[in-house]
């Protein structure tokens, strides 16, 4: 899977990222205490990168609307990452 995510912190502001290894990226973000506000998965890397570039071209107001609109999907994806992490830790 390929992932597009959005984080926000007081120093860097909003960051729109892409990851092919979201479990590792999620751990790094968690270790730094960086909240994950938006997370969406894609099966094709081109689609993920196109979505990332679309988000980068949008206004901050529209990005915040995306974050609100996809809150439930972001939570499901985040929970799935946590479950996968827990399963890996038990082996």
For each feature predicted by the language model, list its residue ranges.
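GIY-YIG-like beta-to-alpha core
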Residues: 2-32, 41, 53-57
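Sequence-level detector for tyrosine residue identity
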Residues: 2-5, 38, 70, 85
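Intrinsic-disorder/low-complexity regions
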Residues: 8, 22, 46, 78, ...
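A generic signature of intrinsically disordered, low-complexity regions enriched in glycine/proline
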Residues: 13, 27, 51, 61, ...
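Aromatic/basic micro-patches that form nucleic-acid/chromatin recognition or nuclease catalytic surfaces
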Residues: 30-75
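A cross-kingdom feature marking charged/low-complexity
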Residues: 70-91
């Amino acid at each position: 899977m390929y992932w597009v995510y959005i984080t926000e912190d007081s120093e860097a502001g909003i960051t729109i990222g892409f990851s092919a290894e979201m479990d590792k990226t999620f751990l790094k973000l968690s270790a730094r205490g960086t909240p994950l506000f938006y997370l969406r998965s894609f099966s094709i890397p081109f689609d993920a990168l196109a979505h990332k570039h679309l988000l980068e071209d949008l206004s901050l107001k529209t990005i915040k609307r995306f974050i609100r609109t996809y809150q439930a999907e972001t939570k499901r994806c985040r929970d799935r990452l946590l479950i996968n992490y827990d399963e890996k830790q038990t082996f």
